[in-house]
Amino acid sequence: MVMPLALLEKSMNKKISLLLKDNRVLEGKLTGYDEYMNMVLEETEERTAEQTRRLGVVVLRGNNVVSISPLN
């Protein structure tokens, strides 16, 4: 099993997908994080069942994240 902070370290400056507690999905380039898993994403898009929105730079509180997946 990969530890979350190790995955974030490997994913720096790469695209990731985040599933949030409210079932939204954010996809963007990880440009920063801290020990609480708060993250900074650039070129971020929010995906819901109905639509996709471009958000740009997002600062995300770590406790809102359910899962983290690297994108190729």
Q: Across the structure, where does each feature detected by a protein language model lie?
A:
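Conserved RNA-binding domains used in RNP assembly and mRNA/RNA metabolism
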Residues: 1-72
